[in-house]
Structures are given as structure tokens and as C-alpha cells.
Amino acid sequence: MTANVDGVPEKFATLGLTYDDVLLLPGASEVLPNAVDISSRISRNVRVNIPLLSAAMDKVTESRMAIAMARQGGVGVLHRNLSIEDQVNQVDLVKRSESGMVTDPITVHPDATLAEADALCAKFRISGVPVTDPAGKLLGIVTNRDMAFESDRSRQVREVMTPMPLVTGKVGISGVDAMELLRRHKIEKLPLVDDAGVLKGLITVKDFVKAEQYPNAAKDAEGRLLVGAAVGASPEALERAQALAGAGVDFLIVDTSHGHNSNALSWMGKIKSSVGVDVIGGNVATRDGAQALIDAGVDGVKVGVGPGSICTTRVVAGIGVPQVTAIYEAALAARAAGVPVIGDGGLQYSGDIGKALAAGADTVMLGSLLAGCEESPGELLFINGKQFKSYRGMGSLGAMQSRGQGRSYSKDRYFQADVASDDKLVPEGIEGQVPYRGPLANVLHQLVGGLRQTMGYVGAASIDEMETKGRFVRITSAGLKESHPHDIQMTVEAPNYSRK
């Protein structure tokens, strides 16, 4: 650690600062908030258009949240409190939600029943599927309209499908030509076939509509939405990582409470060498911890030990580093290696995002700020006439308790995988609820808008400039009190402020 206080014994000499301890200094600026570049890296090879990730928590990020995050320019990290099969399915749902071209379209056999075809459409939230033979040759297409008025769900698909010849395109068709075919023939789906008539891809009107509706969406090289996923540090994690990579996940986060641990570091190296996607390591809170992750070969460093609103690590274990100092320290190691830093936890207001970036983070991960969104998987609750959504830490008793066939996918994050009985678990988190906040797009609009304002005040035209130009002033408790609205009874809540 670097920040020592004169006259204090070395063992106690490190000063730790968090978001409420500092403010950013306003600087000379020619930067307009609406003109700043807020794109950034989350790992060596993955970029996002806004520097925000949704946390890998079971009350924050599943496929619906991940889709919404990517459409707004960020990215969601799917939690791992799921079976491998279920987590892979979540990745598949995100990747199939929209794309420039579906390279591996869902298909159905002509002998399948309408009930089976309908279930397939419902599972993947699609309105129809191509019909192919075992060799992959396109035979026709069946859509919701074909099935809508069929009361006998045991009928075969071949009896109601629209058979060949269909309007099709060749592999490699341009987006302009594909759109022209869709428009001219008034169809919603354009199958792509090779010279032998074998189905090779699918383009839909929906993808063009979504591209216009969400121009800032974060996408991969194939035009699919970006998505990440969390894995653990164990033999099961290696199998999980390989399955997720095979499903098309863009990056993995090795998700542990203490990344500066030899076992965790060993598994990070094994996972990195076995998959062809970027691997982010975490969590750490010191320069040495970040360096250990980098030495293990990770492509990104996730910082935060105990800052989250639902985390009790700092009081149960007495461990942690205030988040601004933790980010600054980790960035000292990461910058030299060209590895991005993710600030994970402790953010309460949009202004905290700018503070994290100025301290050295490239992006930030959000939990409680997004847990109240419509797209989060938490249960919607009504309490005294007000709406809330359930939220809990992944170290809470509820998250770590056995699931399904006596299996927990969360407790190994806190190195308690071998605890056989739930009543012997030592939780490092709590369960509760947060106010319902409506659609994610509205919440992100306020968070991103606040960040743009921060950058305008600092005079930073990009995320990189936030770190180089951002300067802090440490404040007292009186300074913090002055920073919030005071000496007034607030009668109307602003969409981006409430007193915590």
C-alpha cells in the first residue's frame, strides 16, 4: 500500500478512502458533457460503449438484465448460482436475442409435433423456426401464425408449415440486400442457404429494428449482444468455463471473495489456458493482489473486498480496503501491464462512478443500483403501498444454502464448499429489498448522464483522461453533510437522488 501517514506506526499507517471521503476537483474545461467518449475496456479484448457492468448476482443478472444492459451499451455478467446447463442456456438466450445473422439457428424436424415447436419458440422467445431434415436441408418454416388456430397440438409440423420454395438468401449477403428482400416480399425471416439448399443462417426483420432502436448496443464481431458469465475456482469451474465458452460467452469472471489466494490463482491460470475467451480475475483490494492476478494471466482485474451494500465481510471477517483506495492501488499494478480494472461495489450515486474512474477503474460493476430495475430477477414486493424488489449478497445465507439436489453453486465463492450442513455456514452477506426503480434504460440514463456531467467538470473527454486529469480533495464529515441537500424538507424526489 502506498499512502502512509507520518508519525503513525507502519502497521497502521495506510489511509483508506472511499467515495464519501473524497470529491473531484473541478478543472479548466473545454469539454461538453454530451460530447465525451464513455466507451472503455472491461478486459484486454472486450470493449463496451458505456463503462457499466451488471453484477453477477442472482437477484441482479440473468438473461433479461444482460440483454437490456448490452442494448444500452454496457454488459451483464450472468451469475453462477445455476447449474452449468442453466447458465449456458442463459448465454444462449442473450446471444440469440438479436444478431446481424444467426449462424446456428434453432430448427425443428418435420415430424416434430406442434406442441414441441411451440415450446421451442417459447423457450427462445422467437416467433418461428426453420424446418430441416437430418442433413440440415431447408424444408420449410413454421411460425406462430401457422400454429395459432391449430387446436390439435399433436399434429406434425410438416402438416402446417410453409414448405419450400421459400424466399432465401445466399451466405454472405449484405445487410442492405437482405433488408431489400425482406421488404420486397413482406417477410420477417430470411433463411440463408448454400448451393445444396442446406440452412447456414437466418436473418430477421427484428434484428434490423433492434439495430435502429438501440444504436449504442454493445455487440460482438458477429453482431450479437455482448455477455459475460461468472465461474468459480474449482474442477467444476473448469467444466463450466469450457461449456460457457462453447456457448459463445464473450468473457468469464473467476468469481471469488479473495482472488489473492493460491488456489484461486491456480484455477484462474487453468481456466485461462483452457478457453479461448478473456478471463477476468477477482476480487482483490491491494496492489499486490492485482499483481498476483496479472501474473496468473488474467485479462482484467476486479476490485472490491466488502464494499457492497449487502456485504458483511468487513464486519464478519474484519477484512477489506475502502474502495477508492483499493481501486487506486490495484490500478498501479494493472496500468503497467495494460490490464483493465473493474471497480466492483460501494457505488451509491452517479457521482461515485466518476470517482471510481478517476481513481483508476476502467469500468464499474453495479449491484444495488440495478437490483430494483424491472429487468432484474428479484421478486417484486409490495410493502405499505410501495414497490420493492428482493436483493441479497451472494455470501448471504439464502444464496449459500443448498439448492435442488443438495448442491450450492455460491458458497464456494467464500471458500465454504466443503460445509455439509447449512446451519454451519458462516455468511458474509445479508438479504433485503431495494426500492423498485422501473426500466433499466431510465436508470442508466441518469447514471450515464451523471458521469457525462462529471467528465465535463473535470475536463476529461474520455475515460482515460478521467484518470490522468481527475484530482481529488479529501473532505470531512461536515464536508459530506454539505455535499448533500440540507436545511430543507425534500417534497419531491429527483430521479437520480435519494438520501440513503
Task: Identify the role of each PLM range.
Residues 1-28, 108-109, 169-170, 230, ...:
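Alpha/beta catalytic cores of nucleotide-metabolism and tRNA/nucleoside-modifying enzymes
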Residues 34, 84-92, 150-154, 174, ...:
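Active-site-adjacent beta->alpha loops and helix N-cap segments on the catalytic face
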Residues 34-48, 55-57, 86-126, 131-133, ...:
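Bateman/CBS regulatory modules and CBS-like beta-alpha motifs in cytosolic regions of diverse proteins
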Residues 47-54, 100-105, 164, 220-230, ...:
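Short beta-strand/loop segments at the ligand-binding rim of alpha/beta enzyme cores
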Residues 64-67, 239-244, 285-303, 343, ...:
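Catalytic cores of alpha/beta
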Residues 71-86, 195, 247-261, 299-317, ...:
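Glycine-rich phosphate-binding active-site loops on the catalytic face of alpha/beta enzymes
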Residues 78-81, 107-108, 128-130, 168-170, ...:
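Catalytic beta/alpha-barrel core
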Residues 80-95, 131, 135-151, 182, ...:
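Terminal amphipathic helices with adjacent charged low-complexity linkers/tails
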